[in-house]
A protein has these predicted regions:
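Thiamine diphosphate
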Residues: 1-137, 278, ...
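The start of beta-strands in P-loop NTPase/AAA+ ATPase cores
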Residues: 23-24, 138, 201, 227
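Conserved beta-strand scaffold positions in the cores of enzyme catalytic domains, especially
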Residues: 53-55, 116, 140, 204, ...
Length: 297
């Protein structure tokens, strides 16, 4: 067990899978000689060679297309079974605009056959990546760039897999529930700390994966607190939070003491300007205000 950043946990998990299974390879822009834009694959080409750590041209279509063909032929690229894992660095905090700071997980969550993975902790980043690489289906692994070096925690040294569809209680509480994933887990945590001073106990449920998602854990939290806020960085319309809210309304309506509340990004492209990006991404004060509104019911 050692303390590692979110980025280090991803790197270690990827390296372990490549060491144990020679069919696993990495392909992407600057992943080889340069070690990746964020240095996740630093040193990989020296250890595994240029045939397993492949620098691709600046064409996402070519990368995914190559992965698809390799998977069909029996390899396990990191894209009947098509075992592809597509690593998708995403999320705001770096002023990357609509090209690099978006959270498009909901765009893929409605496509049958794809698995959508959104780790929030270093331990889950490693374990969920191992599960994704060994899964027989295409997996979209959303790693939030803002967490790379910001979050650090104990991570087991040995190889392990974290199961899909099993939510994690990030913080137990009795009065309000926040359902979230990815970097928003920590936004919710900061907001909950402020409400704790008011004597309001907030439960934070980290979904970990959106496809499959842990409906049972969500409903249990709803029945425990009866007041629910769904929080995500994706836009409001069509965001996965709408699916969660609809399921709660269908299956736990009588357990609610207040309408399900959603806090999301607005329905606009992600701005480049840092102040505008901050206004776009849900902030701690937004969550605090939403939770206080719910607590008044």
């Amino acid at each position: 067990m050692a303390e590692k950043t979110y980025l280090q946990a991803i790197s270690d998990g990827l390296r372990e899978e490549m060491r144990r299974d020679k069919r696993v390879f990495v392909i992407g822009e600057d992943v080889g000689v340069y070690g990746g834009a964020f240095k996740v694959t630093l040193g990989f080409q020296e250890e595994f060679g240029a045939w397993r750590v492949i620098d691709a041209p600046l064409s996402e279509t070519a990368i995914v297309g190559g992965c698809t063909g390799a998977a069909i032929m029996g390899m396990r690229p990191a894209g009947t079974p098509v075992p592809i894992t597509i690593r998708l660095p995403s999320g705001g905090g770096f002023s990357g605009g609509p090209f690099h700071s978006q959270n498009p997980e909901s765009s893929f969550a409605h496509i049958p056959g794809l698995k959508v993975i959104c780790p929030a902790t270093p331990e889950d980043a490693k374990g969920l990546l191992a599960s994704a690489i060994q899964d027989p289906n295409p997996c979209l692994y959303f790693e939030h760039k803002h967490l790379y070096r910001r979050i650090k925690a104990e991570v087991p040294d040995e190889r392990y897999e974290t199961p899909f569809g099993k939510a994690r209680v990030h913080q137990a509480g009795d009065d309000l529930s926040v359902i979230t994933w990815g970097a928003m887990v920590y936004t919710a945590e900061e907001a909950a700390q402020q409400l704790d001073g008011d004597g309001v106990s907030v439960e934070i449920l980290d979904l970990r994966t959106l496809v499959p998602w842990d409906k049972q854990a969500v409903l249990e939290s709803v029945r425990k607190t009866s007041k629910v806020l769904v929080l995500h960085e994706d836009t409001h319309t069509g965001g996965f939070g709408g699916e969660i809210a609809a399921t709660i309304a269908e299956e736990a309506f009588e357990d609610l003491d207040a309408p399900v509340k959603r806090i999301t990004a607005p329905d606009t492209p992600v701005p480049f300007s840092p102040p505008l990006e901050k206004a776009f991404i849900p902030q701690v004060e937004d969550v605090v205000a939403g939770l206080r509104d719910l607590s008044e019911y």
